[in-house]
Amino acid sequence: MTQIHYGLAALLVFFAASAGAAASRCHGTVNRGSIEGSVRLPAEGANFTAYSTLAVAMGRNHVHSEVSAIILDAYAKLEGAAPGAQYVYGESGNEYGGRFRPHRTHQSGTSVDFFVPVRDKNGQPARLPTPATQRFGYDIEFDRDARYGEYRIDFAAMAEHLVQLDLAARARGHGIALVIFDTAYLPRLFATSHGAQLKRLNFMKAKPWVRHDEHYHVDFAVPCDR
């Protein structure tokens, strides 16, 4: 075999290995599962950032490859659909799934938390601060008026995000299995221009074990081996 042929063969092996590594395989359920070949969400993009550089360094931003594609497709569409809006994603899961303390779920690579998009005291889009002193944002408490200090929840930007996540998931043959968000805020979310579309999503009706006011939890309907 010539040197050129050896080179071509090596490239074919490389691309075959890369293609195989790119596809994740999840097992079980969100509260009792695992994953093979998970991928890490980017730490930041044009209109989004991770909630913590430390958490990213610890590998707490692993997801199923299909979930990653859905999230990134949605963020790309949001650059045009919600110009100026700033998004922050939260916890997702471990590299191999399984128990992900302190969460009860996030075990199969198909669950992701997203911090609420906000506007500052001047009404401008902003990123919600998520310092370690407040458990990387999870200890933040919004009041009944959806305010926290100088920030208020941007329900329009949140609605647009959920719609784009749903569209991106459907475009890839999947969907959204569940959304968990503080039920007291749902009327304001449904009052946005995307209210009718959002009402078709499966929002948790019961009270969750912890208040979901500073973030919304999304389970993606990506199939896993049972």
Q: Where do the protein language model's features map onto the residues?
A:
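Extended, low-complexity, intrinsically disordered C-terminal regulatory tails
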Residues: I70-R101, L178-K205
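Catalytic cores and adjacent binding grooves of peptidoglycan-active enzymes
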Residues: Q124-R226
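N-terminal signal peptide c-region/cleavage motif recognized by signal peptidases
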Residues: F14-A19
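Acidic/His-rich structured neighborhood in mature extracellular/periplasmic domains
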Residues: N94-D145
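Bacterial N-terminal signal peptides that target proteins for export
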Residues: M1-L8
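Solvent-exposed loop/turn segments at secondary-structure junctions
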Residues: V56, V63, G93-G97, V118-G123, ...
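Active-site acidic/histidine clusters and adjacent loop/turn architecture
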Residues: A22-Y89, D154-R170, G175-I176
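Extracytoplasmic
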Residues: A82-G84, Q107-S111, H174, D213-H215
